[in-house]
Amino acid sequence: MSAKTKVSALDHAMQTAHTWVHDVAREFDTEDGEFAYRVLRAWLHTLRDRLTVQASAHFAAQLPDLIRGIFYAGWNPSTVPEMYDAEAYAARFAREANISLDDVGKAAAATTAAVLHHLPPPQMDKALDQLPREIRALLQAQR
């Protein structure tokens, strides 16, 4: 990805976001960046909305600039944490990622694996530990 803004900080932020999306795509063995972006966005939003405001802020602080922007896009902190179960979580993930409900488990775990390329496992565990066991099981990547 070449520099397009002539502002080094913005070019770096775009390159970093591209790397995250590319890593998600690689977990699926695809070059479809739009698909990878949708899955990453669904992963970020469904995690964010199940966390408390404080836990979301702690998690988001670890994210690079543009990924943090995706994380917070459309967020309504007055409605979190949303108390949905694993079934409702999977339905929302499928809807946001535009994938089949049957693919949510693989997609969620693969995206977690991609995110773990960039965040330390203890930081990821701190966020995932806030979730009910059934939702956490959907998200946990094989390490």
Task: List each language-model region with its residue ranges.
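The feature marks the first
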Residues: 5-50
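Extended intrinsically disordered, low-complexity coil regions enriched in Ser, Thr, Gly, Ala
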Residues: 50-83, 119-143
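An amphipathic alpha-helix signature
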Residues: 21, 60, 86-90
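Short, solvent-exposed interaction modules
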Residues: 67-121
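Short, low-complexity cationic-aromatic patches
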Residues: 29-41, 48-57, 99-110, 116-129
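Short, charged, intrinsically disordered terminal tails
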Residues: 2-5, 142-143
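Alpha-helical membrane-protein topology signature
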Residues: 5, 9-12, 28, 93-97, ...
